[in-house]
């Protein structure tokens, strides 16, 4: 439905936030076949969105501002810092509607786990939620008069990512960094 909406609305932008690597549930630290399959599906859909939306689509991850000297999980490190693993799923549409929940798009969430989500359609509350969330991740990059219906949110995420990519880990004012597909492969 995102690609359909993008074809109808040429100004639509998509900012996607993902961890560097999927959560590991295997006790040996290996990816289970279900995790590998889910990761493959995720990459395939990201590639499709990138192909369909082009420069109107950005994928980002969050990195800690603490320097990671060593890790027992090197796939969880990017640019010298540990990934911030956000488990909540959220979507914000035009500051009009938002949803935050716990469900994953997999059989376990659909059949075994107890999941919940909250949807709200109060524009002022949705705008405040997006503003607080983006301000937390982008630090001072978000102008006070930002309007997602007028201004490019993706441009802000790209600028914050470029700044955080070259800054020393401890000096990053925000957490957002573009998720390179070679990190996620």
Set out the residue ranges of the language-model regions.
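PLD/PLD-like phosphodiesterase catalytic module centered on the HKD motif
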Residues: 1-185
